[in-house]
Amino acid sequence: YPLALASIVNDGWSLSSLHCQLSGFLMGLSVIGSVFNITGIAINRYCCICHSLRYNKLYSSTNSLCYVFLIWMLTLVAIVPNLCVGTLQYDPRIYSCTFTQSVSSAYTIAVVVFHFIVPMLVVIFCYLRIWALVLQVRWRVKPDNKPKLKPQDFRNFVTMFVVFVLFAICWAPLNFIGLVVASEPASMAPRIPEWLFVASYYMGYFNSCLNAIIYGLLNQNFRQEYRKIIVSLCTTKMFFVDSSNHVAHRIKRKPSP
C-alpha cells in the first residue's frame, strides 16, 4: 500500500482528488471482483459436482470465457455508481481513499446487500448442496446411476470452501458496521469505536494474504510451485554469496602495486 504509506508519512492525503478517486475505485474493484469471483467459483463447483453430466456443456471453453467476462463487467457496473454518489473519499483513520459508509444510507445498504449478503447466500446454497452430496457419497446412499464424486473435484471443493469461509469471516465485520452506520449515520457513525473500524477494515484486506497460505496448505500443485520458488531463491542467494566471496578472495590475493 504505497499510497497509504505516503499518507502516513505526510499525515494526510498529499495527492489530487482524482488520484484519491482512482485509488478508491481500484480498491473497490478488487474487493467486489473478489466477491463475484468467489460466487462464480461456487456456482462452477456446484455444477461440476452436483450436475457433472451437464458440466462440460455448461462450461465449455467459450462459455467459460463469457462467464469470466460477465463477472468483471458486473464488477465494473457495481463500482461505477460510487463515482456518482461520491462515496469514494479519504478516510484519515486508515490513511486511504475508500468507500465512505456515512455518505448515503440507502446506497450503503444496497452495497452491503447486493455486494456481500446476496453473493454469500448464493455461495452458501451451492456449498450446502455440495456437502449434501458429499455426505450421500460417504454414507453410500447415493444411487449408482448418478454421477460419481471424483477425489480431485472434492479436494478443489474443500480448498475453495475454506477460501470462502475465511473471506466471509474477514469481511463480515466491516459490512456489519456498514449496516449499523447506514441505519442512522448522524448518530451511529460517531458511536463506532475508531479501533473497531480500523481493525475490521484491515481484517478484510488481510484476507488476501491468507489465500496464498490456504492454497499452499490444501493444494499439492501450489505446494510444489512454492517449493520450487523457495529453492530457486535460496540457490540464487547462495550463488551471489559464493560469487562475492570469490571476488573478495581474489582481491585479497592480488598483489599491491
From Swiss-Prot:
UniProt main location, coarse: membrane
Kindly give the Pfam families that the UniProt entry links to this protein: 7tm_1
Under the heading InterPro entries, the entry gives: GPCR_Rhodpsn, GPCR_Rhodpsn_7TM, Mel_1A/1B_rcpt, Melatonin_rcpt
Residues on the Extracellular side? 5-22, 86-107, 182-194
Per the UniProt record, which residue ranges are transmembrane?
23-43, 65-85, 108-128, 161-181, 195-215
Q: Does the keyword Nucleotidyltransferase apply?
A: no
Q: Which GO terms describe its biological process?
A: G protein-coupled receptor signaling pathway
Q: List the Gene3D superfamilies hit by this protein, alphabetically.
A: Rhodopsin 7-helix transmembrane proteins
S-S pairs: 20-97
Q: Where found?
A: Cell membrane
Transmembrane helix as a keyword of this entry, yes or no, is: yes
Q: What role does this protein play? A: High affinity receptor for melatonin. Likely to mediate the reproductive and circadian actions of melatonin. The activity of this receptor is mediated by pertussis toxin sensitive G proteins that inhibit adenylate cyclase activity. Possibly involved in sleep induction, by melatonin activation of the potassium channel KCNMA1/BK and the dissociation of G-beta and G-gamma subunits, thereby decreasing synaptic transmission.
Q: What is this protein called?
A: Melatonin receptor type 1A
Q: Which organism is it from?
A: Bos taurus
